[in-house]
Amino acid sequence: MKHLFYLLSFMALTNCNSNPQIDVQGHRGFRGLFPENSIVGFKKALDIGVQTLEMDVVISKDNKVVVSHDPFMNHEIALDPYGDTISKEKELSFNLYKMTYDSIKQYDCGSKPHLRFPKQQKIRVHKPLLDEVIAMAEKESKGTTFYNIEIKSLPEWDTIYTPKVDTFVDLVLELIVSRGISERTTLQSFDVRTLEVVKKKFPEIQTALLVDEFEVIADKMNNLSFKPEIISPYFKLLNANTVKDLQSKGFKVIPWTVNKEDDIELIISYKVDGIISDYPDIVLNRFSVR
C-alpha cells in the first residue's frame, strides 16, 4: 500500500504545474530515490519540476570535470569493474584524480543498495561528466535549468586528490562558459580559497558560501574578502532571526540538506530563499497541496 501511495504521489508530481515560491534544489540530483549525481537522477528531478540541479564536481587524471561528491570511489555506492564491493579502508586508494575518465566509467555507482537511502532505486550508472549532465538538462528543459555546482576542494587534497585551486576553477569555468550557462550557474564551496579564485577570475558569476554543521556562519563569512550572493549553511544552524538578519544584509539563504517533512516545514517557515533536499518531491508536494 505504501508503495502504491508513493507511485501515485510521484505521478501527481510529474504532472504538477506548481510554482514554488522558493528555489527547490535536487541534492545530488534526486538522491533519496535515484543514484546520486547520476544522469537518471538529474533527469528525474527535472521531470518532477525541479528548476535547480545541485551537484558536486572533481577532476580526473585527464582533466575531465567529473560529477562526483568524492574525489575517490566511495565504498557506500561504488562497485569495481568486476562488480565487487570496495571497502571503507581502501576507498581512498581509488583516487579519481589518478584515474582517466575511461577508467572511472567502468565503476558502477548505482547498483549497490544504499543503507541510508533504502528507497533509492538500484540502477547501474557511472559517474557522468559535467558536460554530459549539462547537455541532458539543456535538452530536457530547453535551456531553462539552473545549476548549483560545488567545487570539491580542500587544502589537504591539493595535488593529491584534486588539482591546485586555480587549475580546478579554470577547468570548471571553461566548461560553464563554453556551454553558455554562466548566468544560470552558482558555484559553491566550503573552501573559501576556491570562492576567492572564482570571484577573481569571473566576478559576475554567482557564488555560494557553504557552512558545515561544525562551523559558525558569521565566522565563516568573515574569512571571505567579498560578499557572496548566497549563504548556504547546514539547516540546523538556522533560525528565523538568523535568516531574517542575513537577508537584511542582502544575502540569499539556501540551507542544506533538508529531508524530513517536519524539518522542511520548519525551514520554509523561516522564509528561506531555497531548500536543498535529497527528496525534492516532498518539498514540491508541500507547495502543490497548499
Label the predicted regions.
Residues 1-23:
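Bacterial Sec-dependent N-terminal signal peptides
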Residues 16-290:
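Phosphate-group recognition and catalysis centered on beta-loop-alpha active-site segments
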